[in-house]
Amino acid sequence: MQLTAGLKQFIRAHLTDNTDKLLLAASRFPGIDIRFAIDQIIARRQIQHKLPFWYEQDELIYPSRLSTEQCSSEQTALYKQQLLRGNTVCDLTGGLGIDTFYFAQKAGNVIYVERFPEYCTAAQHNFKVLNTSNIHIIHSDACDIIQPLQADT
């Protein structure tokens, strides 16, 4: 899961192309991981209006189509950011990391929890690209994180 200069150029050049036809013509693109490229193209299409700031960042990696379908929009993440209280926040369903990223702009310490390793890898890469250093990534199921916690009575 690496965005080389050639892969980024391929994605930009084929952003509006029919991805089924691209897949069928994979042999015409030696050196390109065509499945990964197509996933990135489809993800970028999905976020163009939903996440305009992220769409403008060519270096970001989208771990799956599902992650871009299920993530918060920038507007929603900014709204959630306004609701924050305190200096530490834990996002127990990290996913693509949209909420986590916007939480990190307000809170001093943010914990991103995600059970899928490829999402954690992408989040680590993306947070670095976005110059966000106050996020701690934990690869775990949210239930395992909250189970030892006890509620105040």
Task: Give the role of each language-model region.
Residues 1-153:
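SAM-dependent transferase fold signal centered on methyltransferase-like domains
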